[in-house]
Amino acid sequence: MGGPKIKYSFLFLCITFATIIPSLMAHIGHYDEVWRRRAEEAKEYARNIYEPHPENVTLAFNQKLRDTMKELKKVKGTHNNSTRRGLGTKKYTGPCMVTNPIDKCWRCDPNWADNRKKLADCAMGFGSKAIGGKDGEFYVVTDNSDDYNDPKPGTLRHAVIQKEPLWIIFKRGMNIRLHQEMIMQSDKTIDARGVNVHITKGAGITLQYIKNVIIHGLHIHDIVEGNGGMVRDAVDHIGIRTKSDGDGISIFGASYIWIDHVSMQRCYDGLIDAVEGSTGITISNGHFTDHNEVMLFGASDSSSIDQVMQITLAFNHFGKRLIQRMPRCRWGYIHVVNNDYTHWNMYAIGGSMHPTIIHQGNRFIAPPDIFKKQVTKREYNPESVWMQWTWRSEGNLFMNGAYFTESGDPEWSSKHKDLYDGISAAPAEDVTWMTRFAGVLGCKPGKPC
């Protein structure tokens, strides 16, 4: 009596396992027609938005940056001492003051809460075309519960699985524990300004095969792996997911993504990972602490699809108790500009598979250990190979013995004078000031943020 049942059960397990194996990297347990279509559409979209001359984007970024900084520096002198990031815990209590061009776009407007969608015009860099849910209605999250099979109206998961554009805000501060990874649909803004919203002690946020997303003002911390199972990813689709990695934010084959003013720490895997052909991404004004593998841009040396990856990393503070990967890159083109690296315990910038990484106007403070002063780390390749990769350091500030090992054509700048003259970033000496308000802001409606 037991024999046939055992055989049928074994056959079912074999079929199920065979179905899961090809898509383990995507965490899709059953790669059905919906996911196949999403994947193909996402790949085609990424190919279409790929910037064949990425230096044009860095040029535009730094031109706007320099123009804005000229204006901001006129008032910097009167506030410099009170806005420096100090060693104590005192918070800035003076009048609203912006320190970089992204924040200048919206922050000091006392009516920001009545004009939230102004934020959609403020992105810069490779993610500058991300407008999120600007063309949609507002959705107010009122409930911090989470049902990953049948999300309840008023919850964050219910908001992000809708098919139409939405600008998602929160009625009150809340802690949200996601029982499985929260899989988003395209054309969404998660805007937590004015309240304290924590995604914590559960799974993270997944942006898979979608486009046009803004995430602003979230605390994301203490993220763990999701166990997998049946998870709803749209109002009209639910499917089997394998175990999630435990990333804070996982960007998988997604395009036009802007992550701004987030505070992140202690996730099981990465804080922010961007893989499998993700492109058109800006990560700005973030504050990152207490983590090992901070950011991964490109997950595999064999994933040549990441050649389309183009990412801007700007005005972020990489802070206390970080260890490595700020970021760790493969393939792609990464612009690392005006960030403050005050802590690392292994290295700051790493990579393999010849990514192009342009570092401009950053501050690097090395740890006390004399064996950990180098900012950079190349992996899995001999020097004869990685010396061909374009890793350039321009206008960076190195402190406490920090040093950057460049590679690629040493005459790169002089050979690109038409571009080089326009792409110098703001001075690294100003980075502490420019990143003073990195992380979640303490915004209150009716007052400048």
From Swiss-Prot:
This is Probable pectate lyase P59. Residues 1-22 form the signal peptide. The active site is at 325. Belongs to the polysaccharide lyase 1 family. Pathway: Glycan metabolism; pectin degradation; 2-dehydro-3-deoxy-D-gluconate from pectin: step 2/5. It comes from Solanum lycopersicum. The gene is LAT59. Binds 1 Ca(2+) ion. Required for its activity. SMART domains: Amb_all (SM00656). Its cofactor is Ca(2+). Its EC number is 4.2.2.2. Glycans are attached at residues 56, 80-81. Keywords: Calcium, Glycoprotein, Lyase, Metal-binding, Signal. Ca(2+) binds at residues 245, 269, 273. Might be needed during pollen development and tube growth.
